[in-house]
């Protein structure tokens, strides 16, 4: 698995919102980006963390402390 420094600032923002349970539409609205852009970042996160789905991605986010949970 890649390290946290391999994740972009935007990918970390998207990951934080995914962990909080937001949908792609909600993330797009919060970050003022398109749903397609959110989906691109989700795809990149899955690839960079070798995750098969968002549930696994969220588990790895907690396990490897990929985000600041404050």
PLM region spans:
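Inter-domain helical "communication" segments and dimerization helices
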Residues: 1-6, 64, 69
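Helix-turn-helix DNA-binding segment
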Residues: 2-35
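Residues within well-formed alpha-helices
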Residues: 13, 48-50, 60
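Intrinsically disordered, low-complexity regions of eukaryotic proteins
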Residues: 13-15, 58, 70
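Recognition helix of helix-turn-helix DNA-binding domains
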Residues: 23-56
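Short, basic, alpha-helical segments at the C-terminal edge of helix-turn-helix-like DNA-binding modules
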Residues: 54-64
């Amino acid at each position: 698995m890649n390290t946290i420094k391999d994740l972009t600032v935007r990918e970390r923002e998207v990951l934080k919102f995914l962990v909080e349970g937001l949908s792609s539409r909600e993330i797009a609205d919060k970050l003022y980006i398109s749903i397609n852009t959110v989906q691109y970042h989700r795809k990149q996160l899955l690839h960079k963390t070798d995750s098969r789905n968002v549930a696994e991605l969220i588990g790895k986010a907690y396990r490897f402390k990929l985000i600041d949970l404050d």
